Amino acid sequence: MSLPLTEEQRKKIEENRQKALARRAEKLSEQPQSAASGSSAAGPSQSKQGSLLNLLAEPSKPVGHASIFKQQNLSNSFPTDQRPHSSRCSQPSPAEETTGLWKTQGEMSTACPKPNPSPPGASNQPLLGYKSSEGQPQATWDTGASSSGPFPRDPELEAKAARPSTSRQSISDSFYVLGGKTPRTEGRPPNILQTTPQNTGFLRGACIKTGDRFRVKIGYNQELIAVFKSLPSRHYDSFTKTWDFSMSDYRALMKAVERLSTVSLKPLDEAGGSVGGQTSLPSAPSLTFVTGKCMLISRVRFEVDIGYSEAVIGLFKQMESRSYDIKTRKWSFLLEEHNKLIARSRELKQVQLDPLPKTVTLAFASQLEKTSPKLKADVPEADLSGVDAKLVSSLMPFQREGVSFAISKRGRLLLADDMGLGKTVQAICIAAFYRKEWPLLVVVPSSVRFTWEQAFLRWLPSLSPENINVVVTGKGRLTAGLVNIVSFDLLCKLERQLKTPFKVVIIDESHFLKNIKTARCRAAVPILKVAKRVILLSGTPAMSRPAELYTQIIAVKPTFFPQFHAFGLRYCDAKRLPWGWDYSGSSNLGELKLLLEEAIMLRRLKSDVLSQLPAKQRKMVVVNPGRISSRAKAALDAAAKEMTKDKTKQQQKEALLVFFNRTAEAKIPCVVEYILDLLDSGREKFLVFAHHKVILDAVAKELERKNVQHIRIDGSTPSADREAQCQRFQLSKGHTVALLSITAANMGLTFSTADLVVFAELFWNPGVLIQAEDRVHRIGQTNSVSIHYLVAKGTADDYLWPLIQEKIKVLGEAGLSETNFSEMTEATDYVHKDPKQKTIYDLFQQSFEDDGNDMEFLEAAESFELGSTSGTSGNISQDLGDLLDEDEGSPPKKSRFEFFDNWDSFSSPF
């Protein structure tokens, strides 16, 4: 097996091949003279040809593909020989053909010696020769010093043969094979020895003027690139892969090109001929086929993404609204010129320009006819005279615009306002506008079903509680009320009841429907297809993952993109892989956003409407009672009964302590669920206030299990460490939660980098709550602050919440407080009208009527909690999964957490 050749050997072999071809050209040039001289001149030449013919006709010689060689002109305008080394090494020279001293491919594998460095003057001399020694052919080195050889050498003829020829007629198109001719094959085998680029090809190019500069259109040439880099005004465009220069460097470039023997440039005036070392041949017309597409970049303009073409540039310059962006190097036009541009581009044979998608042209049909400079379409103000006056008068200006937008879209839209902008109240108002088409179906995450119930009762006084049906188990009736509220999970279990169509449907956290393969999506999509009004709510539309938006888009407007593949190609950067199509990417996001906002989507950020928002937005969140375990409910009932008995004042306080602690135990699963849902919804930084240690412990345990960064400040935190923990929170990035004690961290600390505060528990002193709220509502806060109070029915919250409101009202009348919970908080009147409620409320009020008793009660509460850690509260320290599994009468053995984003959507910020 032959050893691989070194780079030097390959180079010398290539030189030898060129020289052998030169000798053959010399021999062929002598043949016509021999034929003209007749038999008188046929002496040695005739004998040589006879020897060659005898050799070619001899059948006993071994024949391999090494015996095939091509007669070709030595023009540098064509690629050098690209045959494999084995073939080139075994090609016979003219001397070898006449003497018969040439070898087949197998023999030549050992007949090619390693070349020694040649002197500089020997570049045009044969490298390999053969001499006979003792009857055997041997490879010898011939430096050209002697004139020995079968043919006399003519230096002038060799130089002429070595010069590149520009005539195509001198090129032979035949292969000579042993025994005769065979037609030339189409392809040429690759040159496996040519590992480095060689500038042996002749390049032709042209200079093209573009404004005050000119660019050079030509192929790659190493020497030419060096010339380009020597010019000070050079600039390389990586997109078009061309060089351009200032006109001041034009003459210098042309002079430098004249010194290059393998490059020809057509001057700018196109009349001076080619500039270069060779005479230029007429170049064939360019057959470059360019393709491009149109993309929407604003409500009034579109952009063209296409490769360079002089014809296309000429077409662009015919458009009156043309505009060229120097940064992106793209042209844009008004929408009203879209159809004209597409029509004229079809007249260009080598250009294919794809128009805007049909969905886009339909959505912007008015702009295509006559482009309006307005950045937003005019939305007529809706007539809301048929909606409850309390609701209409409470709407902020931007919320009123949202309702009008929905009605202008005939009640089918995706409301994607930022968190905290009141999507719930807007959705209720939109649904109330179509009240004649009720019953209404509201599909929401399970933990906020009762929050929606309270919102309907608050904003629609004309709606009686009996007309609201909250489905809590899989056995409930989905059509029992005028307003039917159900969770996503229960909707899947009630598919049999969905035969009765709902004309008006609200889907809260509609991004739950991102995957068509999920059970909740399969259950919801048929409802949305037959519904007349579809109101989707989502605080964080997945604009970066367009594939997750597709289900929501077709739910609102089924005719938008009937086929997902077309949507995926345009907006998901679809790629075909060996196992199928990949739609996980994104493309043309700007166009998609403009399209959705024009047709179905309304999205406002807090920064857009900050001037209309109050400094604080309070929201009372009614947690899911299904999360409270039966054991906790029994303990609460027992504690409530104890409070109604005749007791001394000290015994009453002890009963209150028991009730207060049982409430903390019962709310643990609800609080943990809410915190995790906030994190999954995209909330990154917020505060969680609680009084009982068991709640802080439970939340901290879940955060650690989820690997969520958090800090904790309670009564056991040293004073020196509190400020350090605060700074850690302020400077942190990403998801961070601050777990804070209501009494230990309600003053002296600043958490202005957060704009959300969650109170896991209520406190009987509203002044302490307001101080805790102000940890984020401080100097340096640039956003509207959201305050969420988590309350649970059937617990101490039933009595603490009205007590807090009463105290705030008294302080406000005395001018000691500017806060009004009743007017600034959603869903305040949630409390059950229980006969024993008045007695318990009075007991709370009597116990806390004097603020001086607060500290005594706090100390007693803390002592009670510490003393009960080995008893009752031992039940709390059990695995949280046991507390969270009991839900809706059907306890599956898995986590029942719902993951959704925009808890602020349930509030009406007033």
Swiss-Prot record:
Q: Which residues form the Helicase C-terminal domain?
A: 674-827
User: Composition bias, kind Low complexity: at what positions?
Assistant: 31-51
Residues in a coiled coil are 3-34
Q: Would the keyword Acetylation be found if you checked this record's keyword annotation?
A: yes
Task: Pinpoint motif DESH box by residue range.
Answer: 508-511
Tissue expression summary = Ubiquitously expressed, with high levels in brain, heart, kidney, liver and testis.
The annotated region (Mediates interaction with RPA2) lies at 2-29, 5-29
Top-level taxonomic group? Eukaryota
Gene Ontology cellular component annotations, sorted alphabetically: DNA replication factor A complex; nucleoplasm; nucleus; site of double-strand break
Stretches with biased composition (Basic and acidic residues) = 7-29
Identify residues that carry N-acetylserine. Answer: S2
Q: Please give a single GO biological process term from the UniProt record.
A: regulation of transcription by RNA polymerase II
Q: Could you confirm whether the keyword Acyltransferase appears in this record?
A: no
| InterPro entries from the UniProt entry | HARP_dom (IPR010003), Helicase_ATP-bd (IPR014001), Helicase_C-like (IPR001650), P-loop_NTPase (IPR027417), SNF2-like_sf (IPR038718), SNF2/RAD54-like_C (IPR049730), SNF2_N (IPR000330)
Tell me where in this chain the HARP domain is found: 199-269, 286-357
Binding positions for ATP per the UniProt entry: D417, D418, M419, G420, L421, G422, K423, T424
E.C. number: 3.6.4.-
Where Phosphoserine occurs along the chain? S118, S165
Q: Recite the UniProt keywords alphabetically.
A: Acetylation, Coiled coil, Hydrolase, Nucleus, Phosphoprotein, Repeat
Q: Which reaction does it catalyse?
A: ATP + H2O = ADP + phosphate + H(+)
Family membership noted in the UniProt record: Belongs to the SNF2/RAD54 helicase family. SMARCAL1 subfamily.
User: What PANTHER family does the annotation carry?
Assistant: DNA ANNEALING HELICASE AND ENDONUCLEASE ZRANB3 FAMILY MEMBER (PTHR45766), SWI_SNF-RELATED MATRIX-ASSOCIATED ACTIN-DEPENDENT REGULATOR OF CHROMATIN SUBFAMILY A-LIKE PROTEIN 1 (PTHR45766:SF6)
Quote the protein name from its UniProt record. SWI/SNF-related matrix-associated actin-dependent regulator of chromatin subfamily A-like protein 1
* Gene assigned in the entry: Smarcal1
